[in-house]
Amino acid sequence: MPIDTPLIPHKPISRYRSGRLEGLESESSSESDYEEVSDSHDQENSISSSRHVITPVFEKEGISETKTSSNFQNINPVQTIDNSASEYETDASSAEGGSNSAASSSEEEDSSDSEYEMELRRRTLLLPPKFTSKVIKNRAKANEEDTEVLKKVTSQKILEETIKRELLLKETKNNNELLNDIDDTDGIDPQSEYELWKLRHLLRKKRDKEKSLELEREKMAIEERRLMNSEEREAQDLKDAEASRRGKKKSSMQFLQKYYHKGAFYQNEDIVSKRDYSEATEGEVLNKDLLPKPMQIRGDLFAKAGQTRWTHLANEDTTKEGSAWYDPKNPILQKNLHRLGGLHSDSPLSKRKRT
């Protein structure tokens, strides 16, 4: 380990000189040398301590950074120590002291440089804060509000223009359709046109006459009903209901229509036996072919808990080759099919012979 502190020379033994004055001078000279060495040692300690407290100066507007002051560069404490020690010690001791002091000074310089670099890294160049006045802020806010208003106005104008354009296109399209629908075949065959008008005129007269007759019949029926009593009115109502029921033809079952079984009771009554059960009930859709495919479900189970994926047998193919119900290699299935009726030959049953 190199020694950080420099060697301090001890007070040398006074040499023999001829005369008392020479001895005193030598003693005084030795004492002065000792004082010079101690002063140089104190000065070196102050320099080493001051190197750790050097504040860096950042480059700004052409000002260069300085690591140490110019006063410390001119001082070389190693030389002072070596010169003072060489007067009193041998050549070997002076060489050893010089090497140790040089090593310690180089280590101090390295440590000071590293500390300086670390200090530079820690410190960051802080920019001065910029303060904006309230007037500028209010002006910026007003500009933003004006831009938003302009955007809204421009968007509204664009929307109005697009609506007007669409309306004009619709009008032109309608006008073109009307022009295409105009019948400009007048005067081609006047005789046939006259016959067609005559037929239309006769049909119009017939329709008007039928309406007038129907109104007269309704008026007569109202007058007759006013003259009837309560029993006659009930009998007339039953008669009209039966006539309307007979006039209706029984319709066939529609696609996915719910089936209502009429049962075996009250079949001797006409209201049960002659009723059409294929009519749609209240709230039931009659033509489910017009509905979308997900809504084509029997009954009113759409979007309910009882809805299943199976709709009707015509929609499901149960004759697939990979189906388990038609696997000829499955012995359990073949055994069950053999027990069912109508699935095997009509040969007579073979009776077992008694043994």
From Swiss-Prot:
GO BP annotation list: mRNA cis splicing, via spliceosome; mRNA splicing, via spliceosome
InterPro entries registered for this protein in UniProt: MFAP1, MFAP1_C
Composition bias type Low complexity, residue spans: 91-105
Region (Disordered): 1-121, 226-253, 336-355
Pfam families attached to this UniProt entry: MFAP1
Residue ranges with Polar residues bias: 65-87
Biased composition regions of type Acidic residues, renumbered to the chain: 24-37, 106-117
UniProt name for this protein: Uncharacterized protein C1782.03
Domain of life of the source: Eukaryota
A single Gene Ontology CC term: U2-type spliceosomal complex
Biased composition (Basic and acidic residues): 226-245
Annotated transmembrane regions: none
